[in-house]
Each structure stands twice: as structure tokens, then as C-alpha cells.
């Protein structure tokens, strides 16, 4: 009897990941449907996953190692996009995000480091100025004065407005938030649960494309 129970326990342990993935998604619990669905960018046959985040968000900093590893393993038909959370006013961190994307390789080198500087080492305050951020990014090979100028460039204004509009459209409740194809805003009860739900919604959208 004990041997049989042990066998059942082993089988349950082996099957539990598959069962968790196969668990049917529940609207209102696992995700909500966006009332006016629209992807951030044209899909062109891709499945879009957007993570709305803030460098000043402690939860986003906790989520980043998980979502970064998950993103690295996504198949070619999935397009992952980071999108800074822009609320009412201007946000220097959002401007720094877009300015960093304008310099080849800078975003990849600095993204995780900004999270750590704000949320772990406290080298950057949550309400950092343009000058403070430019000085930080200078550690990664850019001229601080030129980076500050790039952050203030009016050409970034439409990008911030676009991020703000997207947040309104998906009724952003906070950060981090993941949205699939502009249609599904992921809920979940943990960071890993958010990724589980994302995987299933990606599979759902992939099936719909066939």
C-alpha cells in the first residue's frame, strides 16, 4: 500500500507541470478582455506580448529576471515589447528608456542595471532628474550631455503619448502588466502564474491564426 501511494505521488509530481499548463483559463480570474482590442504595433502574422513596466516599480524589478528569461525562449512567431508606464505627466525614466533604445546596444546593456540602481542599490531615486539619469547611462558608454539632450528631444513626445494611450486603452491597473495581442490583459496570482497564462494565451492566439 505504501509502495502504491509512493508511486502515485511520483506520478503526480511528474504530471503536475503539464496539468498546470493544461488548466483551462478563466476570464476575470486569469485575464480580462480589453473592451476595444488593438495591438500596440501591427501584428503582421506575429503574436504580440507587451509588458508595461516602470523602472521605479519594485514589483517590476522582481519580475524582470523571470520575464527576461522567459522572453529569451519565445518562439519566432512571438514579438515581445517592453513599454514604459506613462501616466498623467512626463516621466524621465520613460524618456531614458526611449533614448537608450536610440543608441545601438545601450538598452540591452543597461535595462537590468537601471532596475537594480533604483530598487536595490538606490543609486538612482525614483524621481530621478534628466541629469541624474544621463549621468547613470554615461557608465555604459554614452556622453552624458548628449544623452540628456536625447531625453529632452521633442521627437520622444509621440512615443510617450503612444505609451500613455495604450495604458488607457487596456485600462492599466498597475505594473507590471502583460497584454497579449492588445486583446487580453493578464491577471494571475504570482509572477510565474502570469507567465503561465501568457503561454496559454499565446497558444490560443496561435491556434486562431491557423
Predicted feature descriptions by range:
Residues 62, 68, 72-79, 101-105, ...:
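Sec-exported extracytoplasmic/periplasmic mature domains
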Residues 60, 90-93, 126, 160, ...:
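Alpha-helix N-cap/helix-start motif
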Residues 2-5, 54, 138-210:
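C-terminal cap of thioredoxin/glutaredoxin-like
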Residues 64-71, 93-97, 111, 130, ...:
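Extracytoplasmic/secreted envelope proteins and their assembly/folding machinery
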Residues 55-59, 86-90, 116-121, 156, ...:
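Solvent-exposed loop/turn segments at secondary-structure junctions
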Residues 2-89, 168-169, 205-210:
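Extracytoplasmic thiol/disulfide redox context detector
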Residues 74-103, 107-138:
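Structural microenvironment flanking redox-active thiols in thiol-disulfide oxidoreductases
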Amino acid at each position: 500500500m505504501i509502495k502504491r501511494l509512493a508511486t502515485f505521488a511520483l506520478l503526480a509530481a511528474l504530471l503536475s507541470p503539464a496539468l498546470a499548463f493544461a488548466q483551462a483559463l478563466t476570464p476575470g480570474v486569469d485575464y480580462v478582455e480589453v473592451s476595444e482590442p488593438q495591438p500596440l504595433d501591427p501584428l503582421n502574422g506575429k503574436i504580440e506580448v507587451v509588458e508595461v513596466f516602470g523602472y521605479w516599480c519594485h514589483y517590476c524589478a522582481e519580475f524582470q529576471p523571470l520575464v527576461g528569461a522567459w522572453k529569451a525562449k519565445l518562439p519566432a512567431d512571438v514579438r515581445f515589447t517592453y513599454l514604459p508606464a506613462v501616466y498623467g505627466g512626463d516621466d524621465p525614466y520613460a524618456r531614458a528608456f526611449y533614448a537608450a533604445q536610440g543608441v545601438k546596444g545601450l538598452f540591452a546593456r543597461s535595462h537590468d542595471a537601471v532596475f537594480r540602481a533604483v530598487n536595490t542599490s538606490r543609486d538612482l531615486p525614483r524621481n530621478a532628474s534628466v541629469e541624474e539619469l544621463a549621468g547613470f547611462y554615461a557608465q555604459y558608454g554614452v556622453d552624458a550631455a548628449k544623452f540628456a539632450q536625447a531625453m529632452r528631444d521633442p521627437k520622444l513626445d509621440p512615443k510617450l503619448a503612444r505609451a500613455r494611450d495604450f495604458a488607457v486603452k487596456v485600462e492599466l491597473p498597475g505594473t507590471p502588466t502583460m497584454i497579449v495581442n492588445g486583446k487580453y490583459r493578464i491577471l494571475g496570482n504570482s509572477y510565474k502564474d502570469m507567465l503561465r497564462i501568457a503561454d496559454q494565451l499565446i497558444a490560443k492566439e496561435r491556434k486562431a491564426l491557423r
